């Protein structure tokens, strides 16, 4: 394999030239009125949204091949995909995946507590809807706990699914990936979306997917992965102002790693062995959207999800209720509501100090935000959220954010927002000793939530006809980080575990800091050629604890992405994409071992899309065009080499 690594300096020069080239841009025919809902809880133009927010549109998702949502997020500024192979996760602004809240149509989802030893990165994204069912993806960079509560420290990813239609329609996509290196596993996938009316007031929506990735014959590479999901929604229009929706879905992920193929063959505690993990998720939700005329608009849902790790005999049931009312009052747009969450964990295998196998907890919260139009061109959003939890008591999360439309082209926005992550169930249970090779981990009932304070300032430019650019600076203080320390003998009485490692327990002691800048550019070069790019600079440093002075995790300081799209004819579109990832510190075998610096790398992909008919489109692409090698010895993870993708989309 080859190595193609442009320096950060050359990339910065390229970016500067691209910005200067905007003076020669021609007007495009489309208008840019992108609407978002995640920043404030109601629809608004993206320039006016009180947050740093990016949108991946339906058109973006259809233009090329993405393995999953994680793959699509690689071009978003501020987003770092950590790890590699099929164990990737999503980090926003330097915060780990535990601090990224994932929503589907505004409903939170998480199954991480069925994987207490981080034995399943990449699983969370596998529960998301197939790409054919997604209308757009909204990504908020920075804390949003005022509206969304725990876990929204790094940011929020909201998957917005497609809406019902008044006539039957749908899409089917069939695709295959063939690896040039036959030691890497091929992949086949199919996903579909169909919707239509059952009566004047009742409509149905069904979507699903199946994916099979063959196991690599590369140690630490991709394991054998099978993914299946099916979701149905019934929408009932009570009257023009009120709608009810019932949703139910089932998902399954099976992952297998075998010694002699992708599984580790040496350096294990004891004998290295095959792994066979089976994860399941079932969910059901009922929701109501109402227009109460002069009072405002409401959005209410009740969701139950059951997540199971069958291989380790663990399951967690999450029940969430949330109701929000958005009310215009004079120059104010008021959003307020309540949210409740009940968690019930059953774990029959990992507690090594008592017979306890069940933990549960209930949280309640109230929140309020006000967008105040102080002037025609300036809006100030401020608000707060009060959470109450029987484990840690009460926690308040405030936010203040301003948006100033200087003129029709320029917008300045910025503010201060806060985030928190509540301790997980095992972390606060005193008679729970979580099995771990580095020392069994005792729960601590005195833990407080982890917190962050984010400050940011953005400058945005948009002509409304395709040309747009933005520059954002941010600074984040992360406090009360929960970490493991040696446990006093009067607390951890069980002594060393089966591997001879002394017990540990969790405390709030660590602090960290992240800061950086994010830049974006969309440039219509001609009526048929468009360039889009993003650049992210991130610095992170742990301020206390055993790893003071080190980055938080797998965090490259420099990320750069550029995509060139050419509408060659009415039926033919071609594209090329460059993704540069700067050097980064990688943990070798876990946080307790020495770190090493992984070198930078660049991937270049290219492909075409051709409309065979009005309803059938064929797509082809070459990924990792120059066969850049990313191996475990140098990077701590494995990525695919050159591979070929062929897909067929059928609309009806």
Swiss-Prot record:
Coarsely, its chief localization is membrane
Q: Name one Pfam family in it.
A: TonB_dep_Rec_b-barrel
Q: Where do the TBDR beta-barrel domain residues begin and end? A: 167-652
Return the GO cellular component terms, semicolon-separated. Answer: cell outer membrane
State the span of motif (TonB C-terminal box).
635-652
Superkingdom to which the source organism belongs: Bacteria
Limits of the TBDR plug domain: 45-162
Fetch the InterPro entries from UniProt.
Plug_dom, Plug_dom_sf, TonB-dep_rcpt-like, TonB-dep_rcpt_b-brl, TonB_box_CS, TonB_rcpt_b-brl_sf, TonB_rcpt_CS
Would the keyword Cytoplasm be found if you checked this record's keyword annotation? no
Q: How does it sit in the membrane?
A: Multi-pass membrane protein
- The signal peptide stretch is 1-25
Q: Which PANTHER family match?
A: COLICIN I RECEPTOR-RELATED (PTHR30069:SF53), TONB-DEPENDENT OUTER MEMBRANE RECEPTOR (PTHR30069)
What is the recorded name of this protein?
A: Iron-regulated outer membrane virulence protein
Source organism of the structure: Vibrio cholerae serotype O1 (strain ATCC 39315 / El Tor Inaba N16961)
Lineage here is: Bacteria, Pseudomonadati, Pseudomonadota, Gammaproteobacteria, Vibrionales
Gene name, per UniProt, is irgA
């Amino acid at each position: 394999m080859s190595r193609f690594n442009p320096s950060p300096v050359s990339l910065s020069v390229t970016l500067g030239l691209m910005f200067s080239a905007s003076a020669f841009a021609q007007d495009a025919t489309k208008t840019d009125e992108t609407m978002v809902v995640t920043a404030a809880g109601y629809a608004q133009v993206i320039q006016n949204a009180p947050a740093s927010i990016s949108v991946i549109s339906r058109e973006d998702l259809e233009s090329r091949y993405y393995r999953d949502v994680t793959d699509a997020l690689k071009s978003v500024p501020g987003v770092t995909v950590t790890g590699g192979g099929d164990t990737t996760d999503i980090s926003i602004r330097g915060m780990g995946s535990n601090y990224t809240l994932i929503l589907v149509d505004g409903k939170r989802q998480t199954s991480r507590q069925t994987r207490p030893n981080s034995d399943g990165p990449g699983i969370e994204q596998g529960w998301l809807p197939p790409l054919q069912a997604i209308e757009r993806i909204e990504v908020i960079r920075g804390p949003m706990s005022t509206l969304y509560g725990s876990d929204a420290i790094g940011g929020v990813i909201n998957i917005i699914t497609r809406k019902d239609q008044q006539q039957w329609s749908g899409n089917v996509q069939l695709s295959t990936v063939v690896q040039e290196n036959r030691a890497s596993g091929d992949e086949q996938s199919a996903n579909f979306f169909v919707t239509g009316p059952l009566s004047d007031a009742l409509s149905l929506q069904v979507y699903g997917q199946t994916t099979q990735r063959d196991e690599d014959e590369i140690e630490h590479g991709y394991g054998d992965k099978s993914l299946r999901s099916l979701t149905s929604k019934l929408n009932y229009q009570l009257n023009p102002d009120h709608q009810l929706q019932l949703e139910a879905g089932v998902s399954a992920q099976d992952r297998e790693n075998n010694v002699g193929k992708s599984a580790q063959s040496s350096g294990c505690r004891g004998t290295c062995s095959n792994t066979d993990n089976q994860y399941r998720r079932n969910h059901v939700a009922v929701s109501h959207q109402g227009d109460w005329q002069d009072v405002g608009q409401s959005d209410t849902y009740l969701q139950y999800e059951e997540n199971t790790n069958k291989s380790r005999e663990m399951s967690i049931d999450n029940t969430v209720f949330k109701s929000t009312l958005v009310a215009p009052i004079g120059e104010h747009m008021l959003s307020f509501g309540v949210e409740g969450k009940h968690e019930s964990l059953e774990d029959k295998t990992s507690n090594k100090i008592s017979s306890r196998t069940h933990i549960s907890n209930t949280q309640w919260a109230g929140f309020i935000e006000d967008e105040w139009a102080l002037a025609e061109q300036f809006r100030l959003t401020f608000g707060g959220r009060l959470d109450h939890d029987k484990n840690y008591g009460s926690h308040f999360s405030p936010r203040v954010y301003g948006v100033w439309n200087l003129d029709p082209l320029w917008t300045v926005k910025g503010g201060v927002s806060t985030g928190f992550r509540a301790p997980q169930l095992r972390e606060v249970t005193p008679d729970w000793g979580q099995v771990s090779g580095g020392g069994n981990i005792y729960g601590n009932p005195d833990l407080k939530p982890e917190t962050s304070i984010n400050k940011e300032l953005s400058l945005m430019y948009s002509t409304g006809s395709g040309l747009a650019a933005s520059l954002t600076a941010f600074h984040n203080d992360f406090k009360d980080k929960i970490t493991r320390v040696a446990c006093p003998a009067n607390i951890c009485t069980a002594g060393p575990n089966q591997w001879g490692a002394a017990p540990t327990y969790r405390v709030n002691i660590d602090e960290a800091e992240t800061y950086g800048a994010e830049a974006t550019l969309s440039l219509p070069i001609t009526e048929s050629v468009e360039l889009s790019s993003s650049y992210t600079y991130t610095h992170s440093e742990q301020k206390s604890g055993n790893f003071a002075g080190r980055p938080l995790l797998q965090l490259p300081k420099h990320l750069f992405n550029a995509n060139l799209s050419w509408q060659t004819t009415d039926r033919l579109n071609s594209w090329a994409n460059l993704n540069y990832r700067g050097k980064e510190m990688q943990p070798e075998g876990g946080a307790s071992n020495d770190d090493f610096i992984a070198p930078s790398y660049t991937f270049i992909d290219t492909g075409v899309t051709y409309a065979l008919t009005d309803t059938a489109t064929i797509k082809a692409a070459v990924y990792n065009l120059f066969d850049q090698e990313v191996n475990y010895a140098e990077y701590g993870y494995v990525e695919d080499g050159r591979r070929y993708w062929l897909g067929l989309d059928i609309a009806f």
